[in-house]
Amino acid sequence: TFINWPIRTALIVILINIATQAGAECGKLCDHYWRKTATKADVKAELGGGADIMAWNRIGGRTPLHFASTYGNPASILALLTAGAAVLVGTGKGYTSLHFAAAFGTSVKFQTLPSAGGDVNARTDERYRSLYLAASSGAF
């Protein structure tokens, strides 16, 4: 099907605008590409710049701690916890930062979160516990 150029251009502009605003509430803290290389100092700089540590990303309902648990390093997780990130906050489907660390992280990240109050027995809406996700991820 043919879409005329003015409509196509308008659609592209709208999609780009939506994509660039997806993580605006929590700044770079919810950007998984940035998160992969972010240091503890980078996290502190974002927080100092006004990024909301408890903001939910519009795509998936994840917080900065969810992103750090998935893509970040243990030092950035500790920086977020020290700044007051809530460990028990879940996504719309009940996944906590501990679930993300279990499914996609490392054993070091997984061990950091229970000591900060993460509940290893918390269940997602699909009834998954973080221990089950850790065992099935093969990363441990």
Question: Which positions does each model-derived feature cover?
Answer:
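Ankyrin repeat boundary/linker residues
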Residues: 57-58, 91, 124
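Bacterial N-terminal signal peptides
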Residues: 9-18
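Start-of-repeat signature of ankyrin repeats
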Residues: 60-61, 94, 127
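Ankyrin repeat A-helix N-terminal signature
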Residues: 34-39, 67-73, 100-106, 133-139
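Intrinsically disordered, low-complexity regulatory segments in ankyrin-centric signaling systems
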Residues: 23-49, 59-62
